[in-house]
Amino acid sequence: MDPEELIDNFELLGSWEERYQYLIELGKELPPLSEEECNEANRVRGCMSQVWLVADDDPEKLIFRGDSDAHIVRGLIALLRMLMSGRSPSEVQAMDIGDIFSRLGLENQITANRRNGFYAMVERIRALAAERAAG
């Protein structure tokens, strides 16, 4: 999804309660990872919740999937998938996720721990993209 489209979608939602509900709904639509994929190697460090991210073996575009034990975090994973999955590794590396995060208004609306976890997920996704690009 184009970042501007996602920002527009968020702006259509009036209150933060509606935006949180939207994130939760996005998370509910996220396909779960298998038990085998929810392992230490795929775990994202720096998140208060349990978070796992995996990527398909495709050097030309990053297709990643993720899961968490927290509803809002699952929504944030879904949001990152919408923005970053399906792009080339170089596009993933170049995306200014911090700017998008701020423009979505999330910077001031989620806890510092959750924000740190969000950026830990972004770094893990970028690492997965770099691994795919390196072959």
Placement of each model-derived feature along the sequence:
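N-terminal intrinsically disordered, cationic/polar leader segments
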Residues: 1-50, 57-61, 101-135
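Conserved interaction-surface patches within small, structured recognition/assembly domains
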Residues: 56-70, 81-85
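Active-site- and interface-proximal helix/loop "cap" or "latch" segments in soluble metabolic
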Residues: 73-108, 115
